[in-house]
């Protein structure tokens, strides 16, 4: 997952924040943020059925109780008020810990 976080001043959600997908009713944690849609046209046509805007932030999400990640438009997400940790096999690779209802991102070297 690319690290675009320095250019995401307009993003509503931050890396490490717990979210809830409003359409597909799952919990997850933000692993990375793209300031605008970075996927291919074919992926968008096949996967983004609700046709969310491409000109707003999109998020790489580790899905709770799953092994996959998702790529989600900001308009489909809401903050998850549960503050419960996420179970995902990549958690320890992406984050250093969990405090006060959010994950602490690992520092990435270039």
Where are the model-predicted features located?
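Generic preference for well-ordered secondary structure
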Residues: 3, 12-17, 45, 79-82, ...
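Short, solvent-exposed secondary-structure boundary/capping segments
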Residues: 37-46
């Amino acid at each position: 997952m690319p690290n675009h976080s320095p250019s995401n001043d307009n993003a509503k959600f931050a890396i490490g924040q717990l979210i809830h997908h409003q359409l597909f009713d799952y919990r997850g944690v933000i692993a990375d943020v793209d300031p605008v849609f970075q996927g291919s046209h074919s992926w968008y046509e096949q996967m983004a059925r609700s046709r969310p805007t491409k000109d707003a932030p999109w998020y790489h999400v580790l899905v709770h109780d799953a092994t996959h990640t998702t790529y989600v438009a900001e308009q489909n997400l809401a903050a998850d008020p549960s503050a419960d940790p996420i179970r995902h096999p990549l958690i320890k690779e992406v984050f250093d810990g969990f405090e006060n209802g959010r994950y602490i991102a690992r520092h990435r070297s270039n």
